[in-house]
From Swiss-Prot:
Record protein name field: Replication factor C subunit 3
Family: Belongs to the activator 1 small subunits family.
Quaternary structure annotation from Swiss-Prot or TrEMBL: Heterotetramer of subunits RFC2, RFC3, RFC4 and RFC5 that can form a complex with RFC1.
Distribution of this protein across tissues and organs: Expressed in roots, leaves, shoot apical meristem (SAM), flag leaves and panicles.
GO CC annotation, single: nucleus
Binding-site list for ATP: Y77, G78, P79, P80, G81, T82, G83, K84
Function: May be involved in DNA replication and thus regulate cell proliferation.
Induction profile: Down-regulated by sucrose starvation.
Alphabetized SMART domains for the sequence: AAA (SM00382)
Organismal lineage: Eukaryota, Viridiplantae, Streptophyta, Embryophyta, Tracheophyta
Pfam families: AAA, RCF1-5-like_lid, Rep_fac_C
Keywords: ATP-binding, DNA replication, Nucleotide-binding, Nucleus
Disordered, as annotated region: 1-39
Molecular functions per Gene Ontology: ATP binding; ATP hydrolysis activity; DNA binding
């Protein structure tokens, strides 16, 4: 965590409610759709700091700063689905209670990323005097989600706004890539990194939701959900809800069919072909499986790469193999021909097989 400007006690302002509380008619981040069809990512979003599934050290620190009336400007960064937005919204609910709507300005910087937003909406909101009506704190809050999508000019303009309105407003910036935030903004905020969630936390939260919804999920299905989420709670919930809509019983196979990812047994079969069969046989078999199961070559590459770590082979062969697989995945990201890259994949393993045979002798 990097240091911030000295956090001073929050000052109490008085006067009119802030303008621009809703951004151009957009629903705020915290609005939760009603009804049974509500996305589970919103239905089960933590409502208080105590409900946040992980990162207890960060949450406890922010909670303590809030209780001591010393909340600084915040910069929360890390991969998607790790609780950044939920944490800030929980802080805002704790601070403002029923006055939440009047005291916080929520903007998604990926949609509203220009300098005009800083000069108009944020400047107007921060400069307006607020009347707390008994809220615990009367300092206002500006929440900028996906702040790394803001233009550099907008970030420099925001720096000046933060300096000018520190006594009356706290700014909370949320982003995935902290290197896209200018140093001048970073130095004015206290930084917290939200790492991908541990599989244990994802599993426990999923168990709670499965029980609440009365779902039929076996152990294989739950393990598949945790594995495919890669520490992203939002992704895990979306996969769970999608699979539930497609299948009454949520099994490992149902989860993989819903997401289109290759199953572990498919990867084992593909690895067997790559390590044992001829070029033509491997090409035909993998192509047939891709067509039959609707698999994407890039997903196969990623899973095969992880499988390579489990195979016994000389270190130099493994290093070259992983490097070649990374090159193939890179080329696929530029929409290169799938058949050509499948051929490159098989050729890479053919070379690795030759190197392993030579090393054995």
């Amino acid at each position: 965590m990097a240091g911030a400007t000295a956090a001073t006690p929050m000052d109490i302002d008085a006067a009119a409610p802030p303008p621009g509380a809703a951004a151009k008619g957009k629903a705020p981040l915290s609005s939760t759709p009603g009804g049974r069809a509500a996305p589970w990512v919103e239905k089960y979003r933590p409502q208080s700091l105590g409900d946040v599934a992980a990162h207890r050290d960060i949450v406890d620190t922010i909670d303590r700063l809030t209780n001591e009336n010393r909340l600084p400007h915040l910069l929360l960064y890390g991969p998607p689905g790790t609780g950044k937005t939920s944490t800030i919204l929980a802080v805002a609910r704790k601070l403002y209670g029923s006055q939440y709507g009047n005291m916080i300005l929520e903007l998604n910087a990926s949609d509203e990323r220009g300098i005009d937003v800083v000069r108009q909406q944020i400047q107007d909101f921060a400069s307006a005097r607020s009347l707390s009506f008994g809220a615990k704190q009367s300092v206002k809050m500006v929440l900028l989600d996906e702040a790394d999508a803001m233009t550099k000019d907008a970030q420099f303009a925001l720096r000046r706004v933060i300096e000018k309105h520190t006594r009356s407003t706290r700014f909370a910036l949320i982003c995935n890539h902290v290197n896209k935030i200018i140093p001048a903004l970073q130095s004015r905020c206290t930084r917290f990194r939200f790492a991908p969630l541990d599989g244990t936390h994802v599993r426990e939260r999923l168990k709670h939701i499965i029980q609440s919804e009365g779902l039929d999920v076996d152990d294989g299905g739950l393990t598949a959900l945790v594995r495919l989420s890669n520490g992203d709670m939002r992704k895990a919930l979306n996969i769970l809800q999608s699979t539930h809509m497609a299948s009454k019983q949520i099994t490992e196979e149902a989860v993989y069919l819903c997401t289109g990812n290759p199953m572990p047994k498919d990867i084992e079969q593909i690895a067997y072909w790559l390590l044992n069969e001829s070029f033509s046989t491997s090409f035909k078999c993998i192509s047939d499986m891709k067509m039959r199961k609707g698999l994407a070559l890039v997903d196969i590459i990623r899973e095969v790469t992880m499988f390579v770590f489990k195979i016994q082979m000389p270190s130099d062969v493994r290093i070259k193999l992983i490097n070649d697989l990374a090159d193939i995945e890179y080329r696929l990201s530029f929409a290169c021909n799938d058949k050509l890259q499948l051929g490159a994949l098989i050729s890479t393993f053919t070379g690795a097989r030759t190197a392993m045979v030579a090393a054995a002798h």
